């Protein structure tokens, strides 16, 4: 039907004592589905109940289509759910900076942050840091033009398939 949803019974059944983390893509890649606040809350509650850490990959968050509401996991109203998560973001998708190898993560729980810092080894690409700074500082106008352009590409593909290959279904990413 072109709509993506979670099979909640299967989801919870997979949370065994051997499950320690959930990698949550929001927006989901490759479907483009944007999880609702209600779904994110349910995911967060189930992960808390089963002592599963949420690793929220939100690197595609800038590509949400007009009219679609994207809810960052770290913005959920339950502090315990948010504290049980680490969010990953970056500009590699938004500004085509994948070669810069630069991204970042954050979490709100000081104990978890200290644990990550103690066990995580990282190094920064100095050119990547400069590229990210430039994108954040000067990229808004370019990006404001990109979203309508991408949206028109979705419409172009949808119209083409409808006309030339009507038996092929197409669902626009959210």
Regions found by a protein language model. Give the residues of each.
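Substrate-binding/gating loop at the entrance of the active-site cleft, primarily
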Residues: 1
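PLP-dependent aminotransferase class I/II
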Residues: 84-163, 167-173
